[in-house]
Design a protein with these regions (language model features):
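Conserved, structured core segments of small domains
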Residues: 1-117
């Protein structure tokens, strides 16, 4: 089964941010190493890192008219994603727990990938 993992950064220190600068060099290297190791996990297809939420645009069409709003649709925008093909939800949860954002102030949302058409 395929699962989509949505990575919500929350207060996770992001490279280039003030919070990132509070991490030691060893902590920064460990975070990068953890992500690199996750990307090598069999069945894992990493997505591209997403830009910061303030760079997002949200598009809706209401009564045929296009509406564009600055920022993410939800207050806490996603910072990344991946697709993990594994046996079951428990395996997806185990992988999600290894994502640095899960322990550094963020959260990982897991959804089964469905094919409707």
């Amino acid at each position: 089964m395929k699962y989509v993992l949505l990575i919500y950064q929350g207060t996770t220190p992001l490279p280039g941010s003030e919070r990132w600068k509070t991490q030691s060099e060893a902590e920064q290297k460990q975070i990068f190493a953890d992500y690199a190791q996750l990307n090598q996990t069999p069945g894992m297809t990493p997505g591209l890192p997403l830009g910061l939420p303030d760079a997002a645009r949200t598009v809706q069409v209401v009564d045929g008219k296009v509406h564009v709003k600055n920022g993410p649709y939800q207050a806490e925008g996603a910072g990344g994603y991946g697709v993990y093909e594994c046996e079951n939800m428990e395996a997806a949860i185990a992988l999600a727990a290894r994502i640095p954002a899960a322990r550094l102030g963020g959260a990982i949302e897991i959804r089964p990938a469905e094919q409707y058409w």
